[in-house]
């Protein structure tokens, strides 16, 4: 009946639903809503004014059907086109025991009937501070039966009483909530999902009002699992031609919600009576088509959003051909390397020596040859002579290098099949070039590799890169917390998955504070006693009530002089997609209040066979130390 079902947001088309409080003829209404262009219908499963009695006789045993028959629609239509709504008279957190008990029974009846119909989602309101019993009833329902419905918690962006303009100055307030208006509704949601133990089946349907809260409050909401945005018709303005439009600030919020692929629900009556109701939906389609286009990084990362991957271990494992292929497609990385090598050659070889001075250049970890090609292009560009060694430990990639040499490079390049730490070089290098960096800079053991190879670098020799620094930032993300929790393995400690980092394209998250530098490594390392173990303490100020789920890791590197690469958001190399950020989770979410500092301790540890990280939060409260002795995660030397 409709082009797209509930949960089918994707592509360039807006997925949308119509919210109605009363639906006398369900099949006719569904047909009319589909004709207007909507994909699904939000409606009460029971008549909203039919207050059932579950406790007292004789009303308890009133005869007749409780609601309409499921035969009015096909199973497929119930499964894909209807979102259920709880009857408005149900108050499971009422202080009046009779109302509470009756509401519990009615709520379970409606949820069970929704499960019987196979509804894809069910809307439940969060409109007060105390929702503890609502959480209990819903959690009990989720843990019984084999249904798979999602539960969308309808949360206003700003609490309704905070929008009243008739509040008398100095009048006593009836509530004792400790949070300001724009903080309040997020706290309702945060407490509710905590009571429900972060269930993956409970998500947010965010109701947008005419007034928006401050930007940091919106940023925080965008780190939550928002599945739907509810837009009342009353918030739409009217343009010169009489069509509904949204204000500029609301448009910006819609653009951000579109990035999260939320579904939109239009609620309320037509406030633009000269126009068809579908004009609200047409305006959303217009916004979708006119939003800023995705950049190269977003296009490359499509489909990888919030998808956890284990960091590569190229020192311990031999990479596959497809992995090399992905990295080689990066348009920025190798042009920056070429520029760095070009500048280095010009600095080391004056114009008058360009015919006689042959620079020895070693590519350490040559892979399938992209850095070799970048080096040859740089030498040609600089009009300088080089003799090149391509050192690679992966015997499979060496096959590719030898083919390159036979077909293209010739005697200018010597291919060496060896671990760089064990290779006995026939001569010393003027320049060593490597691409051994991971998402957290040193997490693919670049320091150990380059330290082991620097004995064949001349005393005045140059390493490209010359320096790299890791960065950490605290983040909040229900999505990532649940993804990590789902990574539990049968024969391991039940919390081992929280003691390892993950490479991930961060998407549905909120960064709580700007990244700060963690560990820095420089090459060549001339210290008489080289020690790559590290320890740092980082403090992050937090300006909003929030919850901490872990830390995002980034890096910056100086290839040579002013030539850099970065995945830190503030300095990200435009168009570069070789690295996604890294994520260090924590076992238990930590509530953080506005004005508090987050303090994290980070260690880089090693022994003769492996390297690992340990981490712990020490403020605002202490967590346990994660990954002691590398018990859950190590990087093999």
UniProtKB/Swiss-Prot annotation:
Major location (coarse): cytoplasm
GO biological process, one term: negative regulation of transcription by RNA polymerase II
PROSITE patterns documented for this protein: SAM_MT_PRMT (PS51678)
Any Pfam family the entry gives: PRMT5_TIM
Catalytic reaction annotation: L-arginyl-[protein] + 2 S-adenosyl-L-methionine = N(omega),N(omega)'-dimethyl-L-arginyl-[protein] + 2 S-adenosyl-L-homocysteine + 2 H(+)
Family of the protein in this entry: Belongs to the class I-like SAM-binding methyltransferase superfamily. Protein arginine N-methyltransferase family.
Species of origin: Mus musculus (Mouse)
E.C. number: 2.1.1.320
GO molecular function: chromatin binding; E-box binding; histone H2AR3 methyltransferase activity; histone H4R3 methyltransferase activity; methyl-CpG binding; methyltransferase activity; protein heterodimerization activity; protein-arginine N-methyltransferase activity
Modified residues (N-acetylalanine): 2
Organism lineage string: Eukaryota, Metazoa, Chordata, Craniata, Vertebrata
SUPFAM superfamilies, per the entry: S-adenosyl-L-methionine-dependent methyltransferases
Protein name in UniProt: Protein arginine N-methyltransferase 5
Site (Critical for specifying symmetric addition of methyl groups): 327
Residues annotated for S-adenosyl-L-methionine binding in this entry: 324, 333-334, 392, 419-420
UniProt-annotated stretches for the region Dimerization: 488-494
Gene3D superfamilies per UniProt: Divalent-metal-dependent TIM barrel enzymes, Hnrnp arginine n-methyltransferase1, Vaccinia Virus protein VP39
Its job: Arginine methyltransferase that can both catalyze the formation of omega-N monomethylarginine (MMA) and symmetrical dimethylarginine (sDMA), with a preference for the formation of MMA. Specifically mediates the symmetrical dimethylation of arginine residues in the small nuclear ribonucleoproteins Sm D1 (SNRPD1) and Sm D3 (SNRPD3); such methylation being required for the assembly and biogenesis of snRNP core particles. Methylates SUPT5H and may regulate its transcriptional elongation properties. May methylate the N-terminal region of MBD2.
